[in-house]
Amino acid sequence: MRIEGAIFDLDGTLTDSMYIWNEAPKALVRKFGGEPPEDLARDIREMGRREASEYMVDTFCLPCTPQQVMEGVNALVTGEYRDRVPMKTGADTLLERLGALGVPCGIATASEAFQARDAMVRLGLWKHFLFAFSSLQYGPKTGPDLYRAAARSLGSAPERTVVFEDALHAARSAKRAGFLVAGVYAPSAEEDQEALRCLCDWYLPRLDSPDFLAALERG
């Protein structure tokens, strides 16, 4: 089957940036006087930004608003995207191959759209994308709306659009919405890898996995 569109997650898929989301929420809770558990990131990983901020304010009785938490986290992470987050191995090779095949690509991220652009511009990858959409505008990845909006902008039907995701809950949402899904290995979610492998149409230990590149060529 010929792929007519590709939608990429950002954190853990295009970039090795999950460390940001392991540390930034804990730093904000401490800033406002709370004592977060070491695994706070795991507790909030399936939540959207707003829901996670509300959870932190309520759970740790923080003397601030959810909006202040969101703004504080943004202040911590924006510089990381702009200046430091590294590219996942093979991202450039895969994107070049998709471009050579005429497959349009977009980003669908739980981060801010401008953060995705900042990272992609610095890494020299932004030229491969038509847009970056954020779940802050289109809804969390527990639902299909973000992926559907991205597919509409690509001009591709879900059944001919592949979604690249490292997060199991996001891959499930895309699969339920009728998309093809490529699960991307992420060491931060080691315990989810077998389920991701079973769920997805393809499982990629790295983005430039030879078997997947060959499948793209075959169409």
At which residue positions do the language-model features occur?
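Asp-based, Mg2+/Mn2+-dependent phosphohydrolase catalytic module
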Residues: M1-E4, E96-G99, A113, R117-G219
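N-terminal helical cap/lid subdomain that shapes the substrate entry/recognition surface
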Residues: R2-T93, R97-L101, F114, W126
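Conserved phosphate-coupling serine/threonine residues in phosphotransfer and NTP-handling enzymes
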Residues: T13, T109-S111, Y185
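Conserved SAM-binding loop
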Residues: L14, C105, V163-F164
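Short linear Ser/Thr-Pro motifs
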Residues: S17, T109-S111, A167
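Residue-level detector of anion-binding/catalytic polar loops
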Residues: E35, P104, L180
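A structural signal for short, well-ordered beta-strand elements
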Residues: R45-E46, L62, R84, T109, ...
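Short, flexible loop segments at the rims of nucleotide/cofactor-binding pockets, characterized by
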Residues: R82-P86, A110, V181-G183
